[in-house]
């Protein structure tokens, strides 16, 4: 239905989570734990708590710094623009991940006022999860960058 080549992605090591209609929040928490155990440094995770409060609580209980990050289009626009800029500059690196390319091909951008971008699925049954996660990660990085610059200014005074 969503045109994901499940067996191919599984064979290539890209498919690490289930493809069920709903997601068990504990499965995602365990995935993050496994990534951390492999040595991947995870500074923060942004998540809109209104979509799964149990996941939010589970991540905090597992020791992750999870930040409430509502999915406002005007906020996600900044992350989208960051990805767009890196792509245009030839500096977008996504490990050649087929799932990222698949999700990117399912995204349509809609220009709003003041050059804001709202994006949506091209096909309702197709997925954009990996792209959406990349946008969220860009938003977290940009917000942290701003906070660290403010802190440096305050400490240097």
Regions found by a protein language model. Name each.
Residues 80-89:
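Short, surface-exposed amphipathic charged segments that create phosphate/polyanion-binding patches used
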Residues 1-71, 77, 81, 94-157:
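RNase H-like, metal-dependent nuclease domains and their acidic two-metal-ion catalytic environment used
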């Amino acid at each position: 239905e969503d045109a994901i080549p499940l067996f191919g992605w599984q064979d290539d090591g890209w498919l690490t989570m289930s493809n069920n209609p709903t997601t068990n929040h504990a499965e995602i928490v365990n995935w993050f734990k496994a990534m951390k155990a492999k040595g991947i440094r995870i500074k923060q995770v942004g998540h809109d708590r209104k979509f799964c409060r149990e996941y939010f609580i589970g991540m905090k209980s597992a020791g992750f710094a999870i930040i409430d990050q509502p999915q406002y289009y005007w906020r996600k626009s900044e992350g989208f623009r960051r990805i767009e800029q890196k792509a245009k500059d030839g500096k977008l690196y996504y490990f050649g991940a087929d799932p990222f390319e698949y999700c990117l091909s399912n995204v349509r951008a809609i220009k709003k006022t003041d050059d804001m971008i709202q994006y949506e699925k091209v096909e309702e049954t197709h997925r954009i999860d990996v792209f959406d996660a990349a946008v969220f990660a860009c938003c977290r990085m940009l917000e942290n960058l701003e906070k660290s610059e403010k802190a440096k200014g305050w400490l240097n005074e």
